[in-house]
Regions:
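Conserved active-site and cofactor/substrate-binding residues in soluble primary-metabolism enzymes
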Residues: 24-28, 32, 59, 89-93, ...
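Short, intrinsically disordered, charge-balanced linker/junction segments flanking boundaries
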Residues: 195-199
Length: 199
């Protein structure tokens, strides 16, 4: 992941003094996807409002307004939706309790959040195609986790649409997970009311 420091001032405030939100998402891929989409429409990226969701080992969803990435999930450090091996946002109280339970070292907690979290934590597999196929074969837990990941990703996309005051030209999906037609179709069903969805 690469940073881009164009966040709105209000996007940086967390509600916990001393902890500031930073811009840390899949910037290069998100910008490249946004530019490619704009060019395909004969438009300039700097004249568009886009929500770009990178779906891969990590998930990050970002709001792009007039050529600037003004807000986005920090998927590496626990923002937004969970992904194949990252937890995404968690209930803070339960997380604090886990940190002070004596069960885990600091390093173990970091590993549980990034590497052993997300889909991996539930089905011991971080390969979307493998988990999807297990679901098709009747493993209900695999289907449940895929659907929950779609649900949380859709919530993040909706949140970024509000950052753009609902004025969204398109929702763009990118990253390795978009090769799964089921996930793309489910996301389109959930967020298609916001704007046209493109892969």
């Amino acid at each position: 992941m690469v940073t881009s420091d164009e966040l709105l001032p209000e996007a940086r405030i967390t509600g916990f003094k001393g902890v500031t939100r930073t811009s840390f998402c899949h910037v290069l891929n998100a910008r490249a996807t946004a530019h490619k989409y704009a060019e395909s429409r004969g438009l300039a990226y700097k004249d568009m409002n886009l929500v770009v969701a990178h779906l891969g080992g990590g998930t990050s969803v970002a709001a792009h307004k007039n050529g600037k990435l003004i807000d986005g999930d920090n998927g590496l450090e626990g923002d937004g939706a969970f992904s194949t091996n990252r937890t995404g946002a968690l209930p803070v109280g339960a997380l604090v309790d886990a940190c002070y339970s004596g069960e885990y070292t600091r390093e173990q907690m970091h590993r549980k959040l990034n590497g052993l979290g997300g889909m991996m934590a539930y089905v011991n597999d971080n390969d979307v195609l493998s988990v999807y196929n297990k679901g098709l074969a009747g493993d209900k837990k695999c289907t449940e986790v895929i659907d929950a990941m779609v649900y949380q990703t859709a919530k993040s996309i909706g949140a970024m649409a509000t950052v753009l005051d609902g004025k969204v030209d398109a929702v763009l999906l990118t990253g390795g997970i978009v090769h799964n037609d089921y996930i793309v179709d489910q996301l389109k069903k959930r967020v298609g009311f916001i704007a046209p969805v493109y892969v």
